[in-house]
Amino acid sequence: MLYPTPIAKLIDSYSKLPGIGIKTATRLAFYTIGMEDDVVNEFAKNLLAAKRDLSYCSICGNLTDQDPCAICQDSTRDQSTILIVEDSRDVTALENIQEYHGLYHVLHGLISPMNGIGPDDINLKTLLTRLMENEVTEVIVATNATADGEATSMYISRVLKPAGIKVTRLARGLAVGSDIEYADEVTLLRAIENRTEL
């Protein structure tokens, strides 16, 4: 069906979001059009502010509104342990269990040979710099239990083992193919507590 240009453009914009198909995008567009002007203006303002005011921490790569992020600035955290995750949503999921008290490192992706993504295409160089400059004794790899997650964890283990850094992996309370951000808090807690050395 042909919609007026402004609605068609809004549908197109919504459909570019992950997990949003044309039907959902259409529903969202029409819902947005029916909202009060002040609500739409606040939504637009918040969207623009988030895009403008958020950046990645220069130390760990986590999404933040300050640099360095609050976690990297927190001197009470265990400076000898770094937990490596794929993206900032994983940091949030792990922070919600309130059991891990070390630092994080966000890769912004995984090594994926099938998709042409190698170690230089993700945030690994800053991790290696951090490890050389700080007294880190353990790195916990918390990538998803997928082929790319496994490839990434094995690469990290191969690179760090010669440096004498203990490299561990989250325990397998997480099902193969599952995403950390969707795991419940008890599963994540058990995975951290029962991590295994690589």
From Swiss-Prot:
A GO MF label: zinc ion binding
Source superkingdom: Bacteria
GO biological process: DNA recombination; DNA repair
InterPro entries referenced in this protein's UniProt entry, alphabetically: DNA_Rcmb_RecR, Rcmb_RecR, Rcmb_RecR_Znf, TOPRIM_dom, TOPRIM_RecR
Residues in Toprim domain copies: 80-175
PROSITE patterns the record matches: RECR, TOPRIM
Protein name: Recombination protein RecR
Organism: Streptococcus suis (strain 05ZYH33)
Gene from which this protein is expressed: recR
